Amino acid sequence: MRDRPVTLAAITGAHGVAGEVRLKLFGEGVAALKRYRAFNDSGDGSGLTVVKIKDDGKGGAIARFAEVPDRTAAEKLRGTALTVRRSELPSLPEGEYYHADLIGLPAVSTEGEMLGECIAVENFGAGDVIEIRKADGKKFMVPMKTEAVPEWTDERIVIEAAYADQ
């Protein structure tokens, strides 16, 4: 597991005059964010310390950070991604994955052919789909289902050869 930052939410703007911000969530809702006391902590004191986070009733959240004293400071944070280190995320059961764990992994076929690198994980409603970029720059997508991706580890993604010949 690579211990790089994983984005859980993004600040979309200010909320009110007291320095609260609106958040767009990329995970499992407000409850998943509440387990973290700080975001973007790179060890240099530039992180954001959580004072409170609440559901906004619209699929997002409202947050208050100790370092954001007023609306002006909150507005300057628009577009800021809220990240945590991968090692801070909860462990997952066998067969589950975080999208961040797949991105950047090499992809090989079941026949051992190097296919490229996973550059994205999308979900268009019918389940996750991984996007692979070949060495020549061309891209193809594969459903993240057992028949198409029989195996993945921290080191690689194995794609059924029939799905790689697209």
Swiss-Prot record:
InterPro entries: PRC_barrel-like_sf (IPR011033), PRC_RimM (IPR056792), RimM (IPR011961), RimM_N (IPR002676), RimM_N_sf (IPR036976), Transl_B-barrel_sf (IPR009000). GO terms for molecular function: ribosome binding. The keyword Phosphoprotein does not apply. Keywords: Chaperone, Cytoplasm, Ribosome biogenesis, rRNA processing. The keyword Chaperone applies. SUPFAM superfamilies: PRC-barrel domain, Translation proteins. Disulfide bonds: none annotated. The PRC barrel domain binds ribosomal protein uS19. Belongs to the RimM family. An accessory protein needed during the final step in the assembly of 30S ribosomal subunit, possibly for assembly of the head region. Essential for efficient processing of 16S rRNA. May be needed both before and after RbfA during the maturation of 16S rRNA. It has affinity for free ribosomal 30S subunits but not for 70S ribosomes. This is Ribosome maturation factor RimM. It comes from Novosphingobium aromaticivorans (strain ATCC 700278 / DSM 12444 / CCUG 56034 / CIP 105152 / NBRC 16084 / F199).
